[in-house]
Amino acid sequence: EITGVTDGAGRHFRLVLTTQAQRAEEARQQAISGGTEPSAFPDTLPGYTEYGRDNGIRLSAVWLTHDPEYPENLPAAPLVRYGWTPRGELAAVYDRSNTQVRSFTYDDKYRGRMVAHRHTGRPEIRYRYDSDGRVTEQLNPAGLSYTYQYEKDRITITDSLDRREVLHTQGEAGLKRVVKKEHADGSVTQSQFDAVGRLRAQTDAAGRTTEYSPDV
């Protein structure tokens, strides 16, 4: 597991990882100290989900541990902290002042299927899905909402102002990629990918092509 990162400025960050059992114990202790009945928080998670293997380890906090510019002025609290549901889903994000800045809601029946999220101080964005688990609507009460229509190798996105974009896809499963995008203004951008799904080239609406060479 990755527990430390160094950025280009020489700053060191410590990544705090927790297991499902640790989070369950923390939830029990918080309930006891608060004088409330502990909620159901299992000590383990299913080892495999529809998204792949799951060892139950989650990122819980990020600390700045070294700053070459300000070595004696390190923060006394994590830069960011993450809260998780009993099912291992991201529930909330807290900033360095311990203020909640993001929250997430999930489908009761389908683990990991996000049905809403909110930035603190903004309206809640909600999602609806079809029977195959694909997003069909993104609902924003204070801005643009979107509908998604799926066909073979084609996704049509329409906003609440009736503007439409079309995504053309190629590939299967995890290698499916958007190879052409028809924008609402009629312009088109195209992309090419290699055999493992990495972007090789992109052509913009003016016909200019940018090529990419992965450093592997």
Each model region followed by its residue ranges:
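Extended charged/polar low-complexity repeat regions
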Residues: 1-216
